[in-house]
Amino acid sequence: MSICIHQVIEWTGKSGTAYRYYIWPRGSNVDGGPPGNFLHVKETKDGILAPVFIGQTEDLNRRLLSRDIQECVDGNGATQLHLHANYKGEQARIEEEADLIARWEPVCNAQETKQGD
């Protein structure tokens, strides 16, 4: 049996709600593929963390389905993956995603919105 220990970080949404996330290496898989929320995050030279893309999914192992969004995440220097399982249902995941996007305005979420227009 192996045990993985991940650092924990709280991201605060525009509403003021704090959400607890676990920091994983990019490209990681999560046992069981639970539903949840995720952030692709860039760490700057100054150690500042900035979300590049924020999303939600039925399976945390299937985070980015769009090649354009994957290219945006890669091209904008994402260095970390922040995850947490969220079993409260799709609506709760969507609300958390929207709350965080409203606060942080990630560049690749803005690109996704423009593509949908």
Where are these regions (language model features)?
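Structural alpha-beta junctions
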Residues: 74-78, 102-110
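GIY-YIG nuclease catalytic motif and its immediate N-terminal context
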Residues: 1-64, 88-102, 106, 115-117
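Canonical phosphoinositide-binding patch of PH/PH-like domains
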Residues: 81-88
